[in-house]
Structures are given as structure tokens and as C-alpha cells.
From Swiss-Prot:
Location in or out of the cell: Cytoplasm
Official protein name in the record: Peptidyl-tRNA hydrolase
EC number assigned by the record: 3.1.1.29
Enzyme class, spelled out: hydrolase
Cellular component aspect of the GO annotation: cytoplasm
Site (described: Stabilizes the basic form of H active site to accept a proton): D95
Catalytic activity: an N-acyl-L-alpha-aminoacyl-tRNA + H2O = an N-acyl-L-amino acid + a tRNA + H(+)
Originating organism: Shewanella baltica (strain OS155 / ATCC BAA-1091)
Length: 195
């Protein structure tokens, strides 16, 4: 497996979106930055908030795009191109409708599953889908017509606790990824379910 050199947390910019389910990826990157003792700063060259962190002796770039979700690839493409980072060296954290709150999973490759952030990243990486994803479960409203309002809404307190617990576990699993490997990180994260 390639070493991860860029970790991206997908989000919509602005205070009105900060606590919405669609920003779960950003919550994970912010927690990772806190653990690493770094602060993300705005960098217009990469259309996002960025930081350089060190995890178990390995350099990694952190990125939260400040474009809207459907333009996330602009930020990812700009940073990846500048630092010559390949898709296999990228981990993108995003909210996942198909997993319940309290569950998170790593995955390599695959489609975008209707997620506009992933869709744009795939397009900007020359249709290369072969990047890693961290899928953070937010649950599904039950009706596909309600998805937009659901992802742009805030989770009730109990659901938010479950999402936060899964993010904490995802951060610990990311440390295992950098210290050991993806298989061990997956084994740990995929056996976790917050109650």
C-alpha cells in the first residue's frame, strides 16, 4: 500500500454549515489536527484550510476545502498536483448515508454513491477513483427526496454523540494506519460501533 500523504475532510464552508451532517469529514480532520497539535490555516492557493502534520514520524498534509461541497475536487486537485501526491496517497473523509451513526469504515476506490464532493474529486483526479475513503456514518432519512435537507441538517444530540464517537475511533485507527498499516487500521475501525 502507498503511504497516505494527504488527508481531506469534506465540508461546506461557513458557520451555517459547520454543525451539519455533511461536514462530518471536516470534523474528523479537525480532531486529527488537534491530536497532532497543528492548526489549519486558510490557503487560497489550495482553496481550503491546510496544515502540515507529522503522524508517527510521517509527513501528511491535512486539507478542508473551503469551496462548496460540489467543488471539492478543485482544492484536492490543486494540493495533490503541487505536492505530486497520487490518488493512492489520498484519504478523503466524508459523510456516508449508507452507514448508521456510530459506524465508520475505510475503503479503497469505488464510485461516488451520489456524494457530490466525491463526484468532483474523481473528476478532478482525471477520473481516477483509486483513492482511499473514510466513510463516516450519518444514517439515511429513509426517503431519497429528503436526502438534501437531511445532510444539510444538524443531527439530534444522541446521533451526534454516536458520530463523534466514531470520529474519535477513526482518529485512533488513523494513528494505527500510520504506525502499522491499513489492514490493522481497518480491523480496528470496522469492528467498532458506538452505542
Amino acid at each position: 500500500m502507498s503511504e497516505i500523504k494527504l488527508i481531506v475532510g469534506l465540508a461546506n464552508p461557513g458557520a451555517e454549515y459547520a454543525h451539519t451532517r455533511h461536514n462530518a469529514g471536516a470534523w474528523y480532520v479537525l480532531e486529527l489536527a488537534r491530536i497532532c497539535g497543528v492548526t489549519l490555516v486558510a490557503d487560497s492557493k489550495y482553496f481550503g484550510l491546510t496544515a502540515r502534520a507529522v503522524l508517527h514520524g510521517k509527513d501528511v498534509r491535512l486539507l478542508i476545502p473551503t469551496t462548496y461541497m460540489n467543488l471539492s475536487g478543485k482544492a484536492v486537485g490543486a494540493l495533490a498536483n503541487f505536492f505530486r501526491i497520487t490518488p493512492e496517497e489520498i484519504l478523503v473523509a466524508h459523510d456516508e448515508l449508507d452507514l448508521p451513526p456510530g459506524v465508520a469504515k475505510f475503503k479503497l476506490g469505488g464510485g461516488h454513491g451520489g456524494h457530490n464532493g466525491l463526484k468532483d474529486i474523481i473528476a478532478k483526479l482525471a477520473n481516477d477513483k483509486n483513492f482511499y475513503r473514510l466513510r463516516l456514518g450519518i444514517g439515511h432519512p429513509g426517503d431519497k427526496n429528503q436526502v438534501s435537507g437531511y445532510v444539510l441538517g444538524k443531527a439530534p444530540a444522541k446521533e451526534q454523540e454516536l458520530i463523534d464517537a466514531a470520529i474519535d475511533e477513526a482518529v485512533r485507527s488513523t494513528e494505527i494506519l500510520f504506525k502499522q498499516d491499513m489492514v490493522k487500521a481497518m480491523n480496528r475501525l470496522h469492528s467498532f460501533k458506538a452505542e
